[in-house]
């Protein structure tokens, strides 16, 4: 079973990511548990329980603790968790390499669903 966290301060994007991920997992007959968080602070509040996640979809532009800082904190716990940045801002892409992000997906693209499927493969 895959454990997935989705962290985005915009509910619409959290729901969209979840919808596409669930569709992909259903097509591949993969069981999963998906948790959603509205801030990096909320996600990091899990402490070492973060280690239970296989994949974390993470927005970059969030209040209090942005996605880049959240990813750095996640990396303090584990280098094995796949981090996928999902953002509307292309200018942060280089920052993703500093935390060994798996992918960098742009929210406002026409083929966002395809990007999620490619990422999950």
Model regions and ranges:
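CheY-like receiver
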Residues: 53-121
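Conserved acidic carboxylate
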Residues: 8
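Non-catalytic signal-transmission and effector/linker regions of two-component phosphorelay proteins
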Residues: 1-3
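Two-component/phosphorelay signaling modules centered on CheY-like receiver
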Residues: 11-35
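Acidic, metal-coordinating helix/loop segments flanking the phosphotransfer/catalytic sites
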Residues: 18, 36-55
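A generic secondary-structure signal
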Residues: 20-24, 46, 73
């Amino acid at each position: 079973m895959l454990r997935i966290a989705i962290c985005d301060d915009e509910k619409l994007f959290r729901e969209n990511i979840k919808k596409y991920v669930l569709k992909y997992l259903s097509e591949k007959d993969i069981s999963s548990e998906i948790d959603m968080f509205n801030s990096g602070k909320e996600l990091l509040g899990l402490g070492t329980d973060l280690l239970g996640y296989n994949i974390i979809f993470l927005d970059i532009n969030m209040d209090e603790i942005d996605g880049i800082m959240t990813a750095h904190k996640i990396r303090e716990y584990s280098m094995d968790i796949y981090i996928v940045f999902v953002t509307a801002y292309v200018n942060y892409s280089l920052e993703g390499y500093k935390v060994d992000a798996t992918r960098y997906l742009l929210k406002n693209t026409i083929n966002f669903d395809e990007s999620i499927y490619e990422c999950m493969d």
